[in-house]
């Protein structure tokens, strides 16, 4: 399920975000606790063996390995690999969320263009909304495990009321000669919805061909967005990229188990506190491994993690709200004057508590700048490189060269168009 924490961060106060660190569901602690335990156990075993079970020559040999690994640990470009990959994954996640679909536009247009209060008109509108919701459901069954568990068979879709038994028989009658994997029939409910608009227009429930075209365009847009969900599920990011990132992070900390071992004090020439717990390495593990877990969670938002998309809730919302929108809701309030009709300056009300909060209304950033008090003090002239000025100068030059008999006083006369300046 989606973990919503917006209520806890209504302000940017430090304490508000500090409290979020103690949340468990959907948290970084839940994501990395198993890896952290394994890392600390492995680190502790090697540390105990190094300090207690090795002879002094073996310790010195092991210390050489520690120094070798520590100096070359930075060869793994962890920040670059993680940063670039998380940018791609977040962009992909955002585009997927934009295409999962809310049915409101289709239903609002169906309610607007398919006119009538008769039972048949209502059935037309409800079928259009239901077929669009069915298109989304069929896609979600094949991309989301949560929806697949809810609707394991097409018979359960019928039992849930998204389609009738006759509609299922008609749906199953569309067969392909190819393998079933090449013949997914997501398009059938969308085609039914488009056919409903044609029949509604033919029966006179849609008043014009333009309204019919608008209705069909919105259904096509809905189907196209659902198709993008299929496309993203069909062609994920190249496998080698997640493999590379996962390999880089895990190898980095595998080497860190040795590279970050603290050398026994008596074997070193510099002073350093001998601690048994790798504090800074532990913090680094949390940040980098947590970064990797963020990528893994967002890579497939249709999975079953705490913060994956609520596909079942979206299906429920679309079918219930969609049917409600088209179910004879064309009645509008009586045409009345609003309470501000005769007021020149509208005075709006606030609750007593919120009335004390100051509002910042938009003003242009330079709208309050006053450069000159009087208009007469501003002299307006053409730009020095304007096209008009250049053409005028060329014309004057040509006149002086071609008409040598022009009166000397007229030759240098200021053009009338510029006298006002």
Swiss-Prot record:
Coiled coil regions in record: none
Molecular function as annotated in GO: chloride channel activity
One term under GO cellular component: chloride channel complex
Pfam families: Bestrophin
Domain of life: Eukaryota
Subcellular location: Cell membrane
This protein's record includes keyword Ubl conjugation: no
Keyword Oxidoreductase: no
InterPro entries for the chain: Bestrophin (IPR000615), Bestrophin-like (IPR021134)
Topology with respect to the bilayer: Multi-pass membrane protein
Entry keywords, A to Z: Cell membrane, Chloride, Chloride channel, Ion channel, Ion transport, Membrane, Transmembrane, Transmembrane helix, Transport
Transmembrane segments: 28-48, 73-93, 239-259, 275-295
Family membership noted in the UniProt record: Belongs to the anion channel-forming bestrophin (TC 1.A.46) family. Calcium-sensitive chloride channel subfamily.
Role summary: Forms chloride channels.
Subunit and interaction comment: Forms oligomers.
This protein's name: Bestrophin homolog 2
Organism lineage: Eukaryota, Metazoa, Ecdysozoa, Nematoda, Chromadorea
